[in-house]
Amino acid sequence: MKFSAYLWWLFLNLALVKGTSLLSNVTLAEDSFWEHFQAYTNTKHLNQEWITSEAVNNEGSKIYGAQWRLSQGRLQGSAWDKGIAVRTGNAAAMIGHLLETPINVSETDTLVVQYEIKLDNSLTCGGAFIKLMSGFMNVEALKHYAPDTEGVELVFGPDYCAPEINGVQFAINKVDKITHESKLRYLQEMPLSKLTDTSQSHLYTLIIDESAQSFQILIDGKTVMVREHIEDKKKVNFEPPITPPLMIPDVSVAKPHDWDDRIRIPDPEAVKLSDRDERDPLMIPHPDGTEPPEWNSSIPEYILDPNAQKPSWWKELEHGEWIPPMIKNPLCTAERGCGQQIPGLINNAKYKGPGELNEIINPNYMGEWHPPEIENPLYYEEQHPLRIENVISGVILEFWSGSPNMLISNIYVGKNVTEAQIIGNKTWLMRDRAFRGSDGPTERKFMNSRLGNLQTTFHNERESPNPFDRIIDRILEQPLKFVLTAAVVLLTTSVLCCVVFT
């Protein structure tokens, strides 16, 4: 048992070593951003680059009460298992970073946003949104960030709040060409978030193809939503809509007085029963209800308290005449009974209820009335609905922290799908395989982007020229075979040694 445990420990450590070496082999474009959090030694060092907001509300309390820390994750020593963790649950969380090289997305570019999330505790309500910001020039802008801060160009990430919400949010900022008002437009249809899964980490990817005006959402490298030709507003629903409606109702027109929109009406030929009196009550006093012999209705049930004293602070000029409180009349005992005696009620035999007539379908029904439509004076045609109109200068994580110790890592923002694929393959996929201890066809494949027909996967990447890396690759491809082979070799060696030395 100890021997097999040792072999499995050796396999995991080989995976960690391989993952560490893979990170150093990734080369990105100059305007690509990848935060794997390897450069930070502790939380204090992290806070020099990743800034939390110090904004306060009207009461003087900090808006974002959640605290962050640098976390190593589950596999200690793993270079690709490091990230930042929200230490506080049930609090507003925010942390941001300024990009050294701002990202300018042109009409022909492809924008990719990708990051990894791992929950350690169960979640009932919370999110994990990433926001791309424009106009952030210095650290002070991050320190003063508030929910109403302008410059949010894009929102992406999982959101869960049982039972109403469970999906991946996507919103893009667009400026109305008529009113010049800037608003985030939220996608109304959302794929399931998988945010409640605490068993493993999940990788969230957004790919926007500016030239095709299409977008794709992936979870763990698998496409969960693809929407093409966003300029066709009938296919994709954003709220508020990216393109205003061409026709709108004419609010100046009122419904005609003779418009009959009643679906059913009382039958005009039905005859109401002549013996029906709608004034008859449902219940009547019992006809045999008489006072018991010992009952005395002349004695009041309640009297003024003769022993009550007017309070010393009572002033009749201010409070009016003082009246003692009422008490139960001591002369009215349970045996005798006093006051007005109310007889019991019984059902009225004459009651027949209101005379409801039968209904028929209205022969004059004209349907539901709608005002006529007119051309929208604020209409304009949006040629590039998914265009990021401003230069991206900062990345912010902002959400309601519903789960303490939630780990976020491997944040990528760039214009290259292949870069995101390689990062996902060399980080999330490597760790996922180590956790699962398997390497089937499903685990090997990562992304298959319909936007560009790229099919780069972990399996078909070029092999490393390093012999040590190639040996580890073979071990990782078939870990069970490696464990069994090593066990047989060690057992055979032990037997031979015993034979030789005896």
UniProtKB/Swiss-Prot annotation:
Record: residues binding an alpha-D-glucoside: 131, 159, 398
Establish whether keyword Transcription is in the entry: no
Q: Does the keyword Repeat apply?
A: yes
For this UniProt entry, which segments traverse the membrane? Answer: 482-502
Q: Where is the signal peptide?
A: 1-19
Q: Looking at the Swiss-Prot or TrEMBL record, what is one Pfam family this protein matches?
A: Calreticulin
Look up the record and give one Gene Ontology term from the biological process aspect. protein folding
Q: State where the protein is found.
A: Endoplasmic reticulum membrane
As one GO molecular function, the record gives: unfolded protein binding
Q: Where is this region: 4 X approximate repeats?
A: 250-316, 320-377
Cysteine disulfide links: 125-161, 332-338
Report one GO cellular component.
endoplasmic reticulum
As for family, the record states: Belongs to the calreticulin family.
**What job does this protein perform?**
Interacts with newly synthesized monoglucosylated glycoproteins in the endoplasmic reticulum. It may act in assisting protein assembly and/or in the retention within the ER of unassembled protein subunits. It seems to play a major role in the quality control apparatus of the ER by the retention of incorrectly folded proteins.
Specify the protein name: Calnexin homolog
Q: Which species is this UniProt entry from?
A: Saccharomyces cerevisiae (strain ATCC 204508 / S288c)
Its gene name is CNE1
